[in-house]
Amino acid sequence: MKLYLSYSLLLVMSLFLSSCAIVPLKTIKEDKNALKNSAEQGYLLLAINTDVRISSVELKSDSSFTLNDFVWLNDRNYFFAPLPKGQYTLTKINLFYNGYYELDFDDVSFSFNIAPNQINYGGELRIKRGYGGSASFELINRSSLALEFLEAKYPNILSEKQVIYQGPGNDDFFGLVLNSTSSPILESEQ
């Protein structure tokens, strides 16, 4: 009977731990559409600008994901990969020297949405080191730099998919720049 209880407890603990597993994600390397099911997935584009050496960033949704494979361009790390649609929150920044920073899970300023069949720009996570091991965090909108990254690294995907800003606040920069044939600024000056 004791052996049966031990095996049952081991099975329950194994199931619990496997449900808490963090799924590692990698930035796509090739400039071709990697969405397996476009009705259920969208691309995440996230920039990280920091003076702290980070090893990974964790996201929480229905599942937990870790981003640890970045592409460097214009003094920023970028992460670009398909994710299931839904609401995501940045939860943890892991550092190279075995430390980490936990972010406030309830703070909407660290949240963004992944809409299906689109490139979803979540923003630029800015991390600045403070004194005594502290740091400050912001998720800001740098859409023009994100567009430069997509044009340089993923022009084919950019030509196939709509890009939308999904970070804190509202911004229609991508809609104005990518979906117009002429500049509304130039037209108004004439």
Segments predicted by a language model, with ranges:
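Short Pro-Gly-centered beta-turn/loop motif in secreted/extracellular proteins
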Residues: D75-T89, N94-F96
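Tryptophan-paired
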Residues: S61-P82
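Bacterial N-terminal signal peptides that target proteins for export
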Residues: M1-L9
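Primarily secretory-pathway and cell-envelope proteins
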Residues: C20-F65, G99-Q190
